A protein has these predicted regions:
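Canonical tetratricopeptide repeat
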Residues: 74, 108, 141-142, 176, ...
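Helix-start (N-cap) detector for alpha-helical repeat units in TPR-like alpha-solenoids
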Residues: 69-70, 103-104, 135-138, 153, ...
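Terminal, low-structured helical/coil segments at or just beyond the last alpha-helical repeat
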Residues: 34, 205, 211-261
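N-terminal leader/linker segments that initiate helical-solenoid repeat arrays
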Residues: 2, 22-82, 86, 90, ...
């Protein structure tokens, strides 16, 4: 296990958390654009093409009817998934003006704000979506992810714990908790949570890939590569392994892995 005195760069983990709470599959059959979705930054060429086509179609729908609730939610989620957080914020600012007390709209707006780096504003918005008397697990998890991205990991984990009491078998909660531990270099705890997550309802390929990532960052490259290979084509597997080794090299952690392995 790596020394906890060596802190990893937070940027990659923030990106994964953001994707974990914000991204959706850009397809017409996506059932709910405000729930947890795919984690992953390198879609295959075929999938990327489908995403571009879906985004273009949603943009046309939005242009024709910018006040339609479903179109606002799906289009903004598609923009977030495509890395266009600023544009998603603009779309959702109009949405929350029209649908002021709509919890799904508020959650989507909070995600877009967080994706654009506006963490304090995102927290203010997500608080409007949380009913203190009956909080939803998804809203609590989203707030936790926003806090994690702002470096408030202890507060974030408290919210994940609350969310788990409401929905104990939700993979996305354990996955986000695992990434929270990864942000503070507690890779053993991160692995434990992600291993639980992959066995639960709602576990996605992205959750399994994040487990592979955490294992790889502990220097267990063969196991990491095997897990990636079950989810991705060979070229993406090797790209991910190169990324992991680059992270370790950049953070001077590979020497520690070899010393402590």
């Amino acid at each position: 296990m790596l020394s906890r005195s060596v802190r990893p760069s937070l940027k990659p983990w923030r990106k994964l958390l953001l994707a974990g709470v914000a991204a959706i599959a850009l397809t017409a059959c996506a059932s709910n654009p405000t729930t947890t979705g795919a984690i992953g930054d390198q879609p295959s060429t075929g999938l990327a093409g489908k995403q571009a086509a879906a985004l273009s179609q949603l943009a046309q729908h939005y242009k024709k009817n910018p006040g339609d609730r479903a179109t606002i939610l799906y289009y903004s989620a598609a923009l977030r998934a495509n890395g266009q957080a600023g544009q998603a914020v603009a779309v959702l600012e109009n949405g929350v003006t029209k649908f002021k007390d709509d919890r799904e709209m508020l959650v989507a707006f909070a995600k877009a704000l967080a994706a654009s780096g506006q963490f304090e504003r995102a927290l203010n918005i997500i608080d409007r979506a949380i009913d203190p008397a009956s909080p939803g697990w998804n809203e609590l998890m989203v707030k936790g992810a926003i806090l994690d991205q702002g470096g408030k990991n202890t507060q974030a984990r408290s919210l994940y714990a609350q969310a788990m009491k409401i929905a104990p078998d939700q993979a996305s909660i354990h996955a986000n908790l695992g990434l929270s531990y990864a942000m503070t270099n507690e890779l053993d705890k991160a692995e434990s949570e992600l291993r639980m997550a992959v066995k639960m309802r709602g576990a996605t390929t992205q959750v399994r890939q994040n487990l592979a990532l955490v294992i790889g960052l502990q220097g267990r490259f063969d196991e990491s590569r095997s897990l990636f290979a079950a989810e991705l084509p060979p070229d993406q597997v090797e790209a991910n392994m190169a990324y992991i080794k680059a992270m370790l090299t950049q953070q001077n952690r590979w020497d520690l892995v070899k010393q402590q392995g």
